[in-house]
Design a protein with these regions (language model features):
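DNA-contacting surface of Y-family translesion DNA polymerases
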Residues: 2, 9, 241, 247-417
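A generic structural signal for short beta-strands and their flanking turns/coil linkers
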Residues: 29-31, 349, 384-386, 419-421, ...
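Gly/Gly-Pro- and Ser/Thr-rich, intrinsically disordered tail segments characteristic of DNA damage-repair
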Residues: 1-288, 295-298, 443-501
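Core structural elements
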Residues: 153-156, 347-362, 424-432
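Residues at or immediately flanking beta-strands
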Residues: 189-191, 352, 420-422
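C-terminal hydrophobic structural anchor segments
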Residues: 405-461
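Short, hydrophobic beta-strand segments
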Residues: 156-162, 384-391, 435-441
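Short conserved micro-motifs at the rims of enzyme active sites and ligand-binding pockets
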Residues: 363-367, 433-437, 481
Length: 501
């Protein structure tokens, strides 16, 4: 029987927001700050919300306008307190205003007559990557790269089984040692979970640690094994709090009277076949997790390769785009897709395009065709979808860009403005340099185009993505230059530790 293993899961607390606070010489735990690109309008997503601002029931991935609205609600209540204590000031408009505001939680808690304010920090993705790398190197002072798995930019799993006797420490002591060093070096605190498998370590961090008091530095560390998991979490709700259990899965479980992990475990005793009918092979994962089991260890997750065989580019436009400008964006996105395929030495069998229309098309009246509801419950025109299959798998820009433009023309209503565009390269496979030819195929021309793409890619990788651009990328409404300066769809910012103004 294999020896029981011990895993850590470590999550950096409100990572992006914490980096912005530290770089401003502010306390990440008491400073009200959101990371969001306000230049994109208030519909933009907040990439992070500081802990003190989350305390006002602002979720970590809210839209900026949702944070703005919640702060207005809080300030309406605080202003009443200021008026009652005669600390508000009456303006020339005859309305009461705060005499002062603060973005510091300690000041706000000690003086209920202060107005709640907050900092909106533009995202600096390169800076976050640099700090994440620095923190990863801290972990490597204690464990081997073979025993650590970066789950995301701010979260890692570590197999500490062999290190506990080496350091003569408990798992809790080793976790605290690493978290303390990260805090000392970067000013960023963390939450950690300890488990007898990866799943339990993750739940200890995500769920259990949230319900225990933090120390003076905001650090929380919780532990779970299979028995304590069943005792503490079998009745926990909602099910969406559990790792890898999304809303769709929960909806199907609840349709069968399953509302907790305890319900699922008991159902699996006699209803295992039914679970496989509902969820297919995923039922095995659900059943294992219901009982607190996870067969995969560090070696398995490190060797896992996603089975996806598509590459996609998506973009939400900053304003509604008319037909011609949207077509320009499609050509730009197809070019980006072409370079990604070229860099990965892949070819695609087809391209799928989805065009999402703006709600102004309905709001202005006159639109009487098919509609759908967006995530906010608003009525918008039904999105357009289409696919074009190539004569042979390809990554050539002349084919991908031109066929994408033709597909756009075929599926898009020219009378409507566009807000969202997604393009997918489907059934991608390794590029073996083989062309499907006929009497009319100029193979030398194809080879020349491929070599040109590779040369352009080399220049972009060495000197920057904006060193080689088409003239169309300088037209009004083009977004290629801006997107090339982004990481993950957000501003790369600076990496010098200096926050943007």
């Amino acid at each position: 029987m294999a020896a029981q293993r011990t895993y850590l899961a470590i999550d950096l607390k409100s990572f992006y927001a914490s980096v912005e606070c530290v770089d401003r010489h502010l306390d990440p735990l008491t400073t009200n700050l959101v990371v969001a690109d306000a230049s994109r309008t208030e519909k933009t997503i907040c990439l992070a919300v500081s802990p003190s601002l989350k305390a006002y029931k602002i979720p970590g991935r809210a839209r900026l306008f949702e944070a703005v609205q919640r702060v207005k609600e809080v300030n309406a209540q605080r202003l009443q307190t200021a008026i009652q204590q005669k600390k508000a000031v009456r303006g020339e408009d005859g309305k009461y205003h705060f005499a002062s505001t603060s973005f510091d939680a300690n000041a706000l808690n000690s003086d209920p007559t202060l107005g709640l304010s907050y900092i909106v920090a533009p995202p600096r993705m390169q800076r976050y990557l640099d700090v994440s790398t620095q923190i990863y190197k801290t972990y490597l002072k204690y464990v081997s790269p073979a025993d650590i798995y970066p789950y995301s930019i701010d979260e890692v799993f570590i197999d500490v089984t062999g290190y506990l006797p080496y350091y003569h420490m408990s798992a809790h002591e080793l976790a605290m040692t690493m978290v303390r060093e990260v805090l000392y070096n970067t000013g960023i605190t963390a939450t950690a979970g300890i488990g007898t498998n990866l799943y339990l370590a993750k739940l200890a961090m995500d769920i259990v640690a949230k319900h225990i008091p933090a120390d003076k530095d905001g650090v929380r560390i919780a532990e779970l094994d299979e028995q304590s998991y069943r005792y503490l979490l079998w009745n926990h709700r909602p099910l969406t709090d559990f790792w890898m259990t999304g809303p769709g899965t929960v909806k199907r479980l609840e349709a069968h009277g399953i509302y907790t992990m305890g319900d699922l475990a008991r159902f699996s005793i006699h209803g295992e076949d039914r679970l496989y009918e509902i969820f297919g092979v995923d039922a095995e994962i659900l059943i294992d997790h219901a009982w607190g089991c996870e067969p995969c260890g560090m070696e398995q997750i490190k060797s896992y390769k996603p089975s996806t065989n598509s590459i996609s580019e998506g973009q939400v436009l900053s304003t509604p785009y008319p037909y011609d400008k949207a077509k320009l964006i499609v050509r730009e996105m197809a070019e980006i897709l072409m370079f990604r395929l070229t860099e990965k030495k892949l070819v695609a069998e087809s391209i799928t395009l989805e065009i999402g229309y703006d709600r102004e098309n309905v709001d202005k009246g006159g639109y009487r065709d098919l509609t759908q509801t967006d995530r906010y419950g608003r009525i918008i025109p039904k999105a357009a979808h289409g696919t074009v299959r190539f004569d042979a798998p390809t990554n050539l820009g002349s084919t991908i860009i031109n066929e994408s433009a033709k597909l756009f023309e075929r599926i898009t209503n020219p009378a409507l403005t566009v807000r969202r565009i997604t393009i997918n390269a489907n059934k991608v496979t390794p590029d073996e340099g083989i062309y499907q030819v006929d009497f009319f195929t100029d193979t030398k021309k194809l080879e020349k185009e491929k070599k040109l793409q590779q040369a352009m890619l080399g220049i972009k990788n060495k000197y920057g993505k904006n060193t080689v651009l088409k003239a169309s990328s300088y037209e009004e409404g083009a977004t290629m230059r801006q997107r090339n300066a982004q990481i993950g769809g957000h501003s790369a910012g600076g990496s010098d530790g200096k926050p943007q103004k």
